[in-house]
């Protein structure tokens, strides 16, 4: 059995040549116990909880697990391939955060610089006290506020006074980056910049900041400074028509009917059908969303994540300094706003177990969180259920991809259990 596992791990070498593959035992992992990921994945697919799942596990720079299960979609019974393309949505954010910090390293700005130094449209903003009462913000949004989601900006998801303005503005149907900024400049903040944490469009603003500083489109900047150096050939904002057959359908869980429906076929010929909806069009992109616009493969994202695990370098290409990356993956929220969560419940102990760095969520206490792992794990996920995490203690990197919006499942935590229970030689 062990021989079969080793052979299956060697097969991808002919197709996926950048990352190094190894048998699990040589990396302190049990092959037999690693099967738990396979059993978990098949269970989710067989129960119809997800159409498919692709998962990669890396330890000490070697791939010890790379498998895909399921079909392309619930309405597309073609078997999934390992190089199929996923919408990674907010897993775009860590990439853009690294990109902006490349410019920081070049001395283009300081973290406490006000954003309006480069985007003057955002100089004079207001705060929504109620829907009918706006007051001038006393503080200016800084670049660090954007990186830590303490800017006061929003997504418009909640019922706070400012959020109704976001929903009306329909900012993600903007014709360009400038149009997006114009709309945002007319929206009120939720709170004084720097005073609270609120997950928001901050990284979209960072993407536009990159464009303003460099004169390049965000797409061109990422291609030149991250994707090309790392050999990430399947990561982009706009799906090339020649790769359209690999772009997977997207699904959503309906909490009322408890059904899962296809909401985007992923097909080029159907792309016009989602214009004007809340879904993004990945074929006719008008604005490059730094907060959620990228499409990628599990393999490509593993290359990026392995580069981070290896202190900013991959295959001899360094995209960011080791010290800079360590700085980014420390907790940066002040004690007054320590802890992150969807809601605003600082008394929730699970919230205190997490904090936020410069573009990454960080686990302070897996014990309080109640999920196996190590202190210092940094990670992020996407709206369609994608997830990655890097464990500096155990030298483990996991990338897992599905395409399911509003997932009610505990797949991410289940995957952590399945991964960590396979460790034979722990470094902790």
Regions found by a protein language model. Name each.
Residues 18-26, 164-167:
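Short, contiguous pre-domain boundary segments
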